[in-house]
Amino acid sequence: MLLSPDDAALFYRAWSALLTWVNDRRSIAPRFARPTPEHPLDPSLANKIKDVVWAEDALREEFLAEGSADLGPEERDLVASWTHRVSGNFVILKHLQKHSVFLKEDAYGVLGIYTPLEMMFPSVPVFVEAVLIPFRDVIITDGLLRSPGIHLTFGGGARRMLNAQYSAARAASQMRTTLPWRADATTARPSHQPKPTRRSSRRQPR
């Protein structure tokens, strides 16, 4: 399951503006024009910048105060909501019709942005390093998922344990398919719902 094309474009406008501004502010790499879906950043550079972005919440706050004048209110709300992100190592357990299941301490239902997650990670379960962020009433990633440098396999016992965690979350209605959306909210209500659609495109926004 994916964001709609319009919602994917909204995310990309906000994300690329933030990456560009942080790079200019911190001189991580020589300055570059703001990326577009047609002319994305090289993934290795995007990952370097994103690590700085997520390490310092103050940078996002400065961006909203000083560097986002050309963004609309939806893009600004989106960037502000990223204080509610969930970062770290996850197991992608399975791909369902409506979302992919990410497991950490909790279970999350996550959508792709431009490319279905089942195309990016066809063999599951799999370990990934990811940042989960809210997008109105769904959860997406920042588009830059990293796998371990070594091949890891799951034995029968590990698979049973992961499936038990997922089943327990479902039984207790604790499968998380949303994160707080408004930056000042602890329980968010989306301004309107995105329109998910299934389609194929690039592996990740860059």
Set out the residue ranges of the language-model regions:
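Structural detector for short beta-strands of small beta-barrel domains
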Residues: 80-97
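Short, structured beta-strand/loop micro-motifs enriched in basic residues and often containing a Trp
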Residues: 105-114
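Residue-level recognition of conserved beta-strand positions in structured domain cores
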Residues: 104-105, 143
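Short, charged beta-strand/loop "edge" motif centered at a coil->beta-strand transition
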Residues: 74-80
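Short aromatic-glycine-enriched beta-strand elements
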Residues: 98-102
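A structured, charge-rich N-terminal accessory region that forms the first stable segment of a protein
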Residues: 1-73
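Mixed-charge (acidic/basic) macromolecular-recognition segments
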Residues: 128-129, 134-206
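Short nucleic-acid-contacting surface segments enriched for D/E, G, S/T with interspersed K/R
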Residues: 114-131
